[in-house]
Each structure stands twice: as C-alpha cells, then as structure tokens.
Amino acid sequence: MDCEDRFVLTDLPSEKADGIVTNHTHRCRGCAGCISSNKGTCAIDDDFTNIIPEILSHRVLEIRTGIRDSQFRMPMRKAVERLSNVLQAFTDAGGNIPLDKDSVALREIDIIVDGVRTDGFETYARELLDMGPVEEVTFRYE
C-alpha cells in the first residue's frame, strides 16, 4: 500500500506520526453538530479538529496507542470518541441523512497497540470506529 494513503495517529513518542494526540485534545461536548448542523465537522476548536479532515482524506488510519481497562488510554480515547461521532455523519444515526461515503477516502483503521490483548478492547474499538465509510478495523499487539 502506498505510504501516502496512510495517516498515522499516535499518543506515543514518535517522529513517524502524521498526527499526535496530546493532553490538549478536548472531550466531545455532545453538541451533535458533527451529525446535524456541521455534518462531518467537529465544532471543538483544538489541534485534533484540524487533524480530522486529514484522517478522512487517507484510505487507512493507523492508530498507535496503549490500552487501559480495555479502552483506549487517554488522550487517545478522547480523540477516538470524537472521530467516532464524525463517522456517524455517514450513517443514519438519529434519523440523520447520511453524508456520501464516497466523499472521503477513509476505509480502513489499523489499531496497533503497545501492550497485550485484553478482553473486550476489540469489541469496544469496533463499536466506536466500524461505521460510516470504514469497512475494516484490524488489530495488532506489540
């Protein structure tokens, strides 16, 4: 696969990442603008908001992070929850008229976990990310 078609998002120290999630990433406020008034766009003003369009413009999102209590650890959890809400704009969630999946490139999410597999994590991650334009979510543990 062409490297240009992959966006690497991490909360781990890395020089190879395209986007780094920091403690300055805010939690979703629940305004639902991403599925109603500003479909596919997050209303929060922080660095992660600027990364979302980049993620959607690549065929593959590679998430590199650790897990805690069978969930993404902070701050990645905040970022993934917000991305999940944006992905809902491409579904009929809440009676929404979905955005066209072909308007974005994203189709696959590869989650590379720094640690060992824990019960429930993959189900949790798929519930958040396997929707809208995403056709496949895969996992690897290092």
Which functions belong to the PLM regions below?
Residues 1-86, 129-142:
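N-terminal beta1-alpha1-beta2 submodule of the flavodoxin-like/Rossmannoid cofactor-binding fold
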Residues 88-135:
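Short, glycine-/small-residue-rich phosphate/pyrophosphate-handling segment
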